[in-house]
């Protein structure tokens, strides 16, 4: 029987362990800790990426129209706007279900809905145009 002292969360316990039958197993020698690698030279900071320009449609929308796209694939649960509706920045345009979570897709700026390209129950991919604002 071997006795050990074990500390768990700051509390010390005396533990007795008895070997039960079977052949003795030779244990491997304790491995020495590997030498710590030399710290790498710090990399220069990368220049920040420019902010993406608002996405505009090539066809079917007037000049200055902006699109609201799906950020991820999913299913449209609710369309909360119609063509001709005036919307303010932050208004919920569409509710998209993705990975069993409801994601509110909001208006990026004030404007008028010129076209709604999805309907309730539609499946969309990331980048698909949901709503066109002007």
UniProtKB/Swiss-Prot annotation:
Which EC number applies?
7.2.4.3
Q: Compositional bias (Pro residues) spans?
A: 39-53
Q: Which Gene3D superfamilies match?
A: 2.40.50.100
Q: Summarize subunit and interaction data from the UniProt record for this chain.
A: The methylmalonyl-CoA decarboxylase is composed of four subunits: the carboxyltransferase alpha subunit (MmdA), the tunnel beta subunit (MmdB), the biotin-containing gamma subunit (MmdC) and the delta subunit (MmdD).
Q: Give the domain of life.
A: Bacteria
* Catalytic activity of the protein: (S)-methylmalonyl-CoA + Na(+)(in) + H(+)(out) = propanoyl-CoA + Na(+)(out) + CO2
Q: Which GO terms describe its biological process?
A: sodium ion transport
Annotated region (Disordered), positions in chain = 28-67
Which residues, renumbered to this chain, carry the PTM N6-biotinyllysine?
Answer: 100
Residues of the signal sequence? none
Ranges of residues in domain Biotinyl-binding: 58-134
**Where is it located?**
Cell membrane
Q: Where is the composition biased (Low complexity)?
A: 28-38, 54-67
Lineage of origin: Bacteria, Fusobacteriati, Fusobacteriota, Fusobacteriia, Fusobacteriales
Q: What is the name attached to this protein's record? A: Methylmalonyl-CoA decarboxylase subunit gamma
> Which keywords are on file for this protein?
Biotin, Cell membrane, Ion transport, Membrane, Sodium, Sodium transport, Translocase, Transport
Functional note: Biotin-containing subunit of the sodium ion pump methylmalonyl-CoA decarboxylase, which converts the chemical energy of a decarboxylation reaction into an electrochemical gradient of Na(+) ions across the cytoplasmic membrane, thereby creating a sodium ion motive force that is used for ATP synthesis.
> Where is it found, in Gene Ontology cellular component terms?
plasma membrane
Cofactors per UniProt? biotin
Q: Which SUPFAM superfamilies match?
A: Single hybrid motif
